[in-house]
Amino acid sequence: MKIVLLLFLMVFQLSFSKELLLSGAASLKEYLEKNIEEYKKIEPDFNVTLNLGGSGTLKKQLERGGDVDIIFLADRAYMIDLKENKYIEDEEVILENSLALIKNKKVTSENGVLAIGDPKYVPAGAYATEVLDKLQPKNYSFVYAKDVRSVLSYVELGEADFGIVYLTDTKLLKNSEIVKVFDKNLHSPIEYSIGIAESSKNKAEARKFIEFLKGKDWE
């Protein structure tokens, strides 16, 4: 009898839990973790499983039937495409960012290996490519990373001399430093857009969480 009652209580509790699956750009890691914890103070039964990675990779996962409630990418063009092809209900820009050139503190030369995200899948890499196409630097060889946080890791670990990352990522630097923040005229607007998957079974809770995020900047 006790076992039956315990199982009943577990099922009852689970039925009232609010579990969302959120696919988000790697650069959103700290932002999302912080705001999920804040939201839990309002909604104690709220739970989120984060799937972080390159925006292009996350987009493909959704297109291939991946299980997701909310998708939050660093390239609005990806989100517009998802909306037009009916993978998401709508999309809305709620954050913006800038690009920065960083270097390992041990680097003394202006020449070296420059890490950027793979522009085919990583918006930060695509924005970086726009900057490089306009500035035409001749002093770098290139290495491509799976997401912008991998770029940061390459530079921090000395596996690359320089890297181009989002300005918000530079808060995590320990062994590296900012060389410059690029003028926004050198690249397309860096806009983070969020939306609810058409396939989501938790749309009401997803909308509530997105409304909460709208009032939250990077800080």
Indicate where each model-derived feature is located:
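Exported/periplasmic ABC-transporter solute-binding proteins
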Residues: 17-38, 42, 56, 64, ...
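Hydrophobic h-region of N-terminal signal peptides that target proteins for export
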Residues: 5-17
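Polybasic, low-complexity, intrinsically disordered segments
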Residues: 13, 41-47
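Central regulatory/effector-binding core of bacterial HTH transcription factors
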Residues: 45-62
